[in-house]
Structures are given as C-alpha cells and as structure tokens.
Amino acid sequence: MNEVTIYTDGGCSGNPGPGGWGVVVIFNGEAKQLSGGEKNTTNNRMELTAAINALSIVKNTKEFSGLPVKINIDSQYVKNGITVWIKNWKLKGWKTADKKPVKNQDLWIQLDELNSALDVSWNWVKGHAGIEYNEICDQLCQKEIAKNR
C-alpha cells in the first residue's frame, strides 16, 4: 500500500522574531515543497504551522484519500504534544499539568483536527543531522526567515 511521507521544519531568527517553515511531501517518488513565514512569531508556532500545512495538503488532495501518512519532524515539542500531551490538555480544559493555559492552543486545535481525520504516524528525526529532506525543509525555512526580516 502507498504511503504519503512528509518532512517538516520551522524556526525563527530570535524567539520571537521573523520566522519560517518548510514542508516536503513525498508520494510515488515525487517530492513537492511548500513554505511560508511570518514577521513576528516563535519557533514553536512555526513548527506547528509546518505540520498543519503538511497535513492540510494531505487532507485536501484527493489522490491521498485514505492513505497512511508518515510525518518526520525534528520538533519533540510537536511530536510529544500531538501524541502524548494533547489528551490531558483537552481533558483539563486546555491547561497544562501546572494549570497554566496551553501555549499555541489555536494551532494545537487545528493540528488535532487534522491528525484525528487522517491515519498519521509521527516520527522524530534529529535536526541538522544530514537527513536529506529534513535539510531541504530547513533551507526552505531559512529562506522564509530571510524574506520576513
């Protein structure tokens, strides 16, 4: 069975500061790139935005309907948030273990909706370790940061 493979990255210059994100979607040996950015944001918001945009592409592409998705991400924050922490955040009214509001709740809600609608497996990859598509995502991210300075 076919699978959609995704790599994502996000970051910024200064935190907060100008930020960018990059995505590579791979299907049937073809890799498509997507990127974007913001003038004033945080690393975590850009990591989340990358994942949201990647999964939105999958959800809205008829050819990908019903296929499993493997998302490779170098952000432990996003991987742990969507696979572990989010269940308790929702049960506790979007509060953390120490009863503080969850940061980036708006983005977590979007990511959760997409993750729930698709068959997604989340895989952490080490950033800046020479993994080809992760490096491409980083380059896309850096170009967007430069555009938003």
Model-based region annotation:
Residues 11-15, 52-136, 140, 144-145:
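RNase H catalytic domain
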Residues 47, 51:
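Short, conserved alpha-helix that lines the donor NDP-sugar binding/gating region
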Residues 1-45, 56-59, 67, 139-149:
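RNase H-like nuclease fold core
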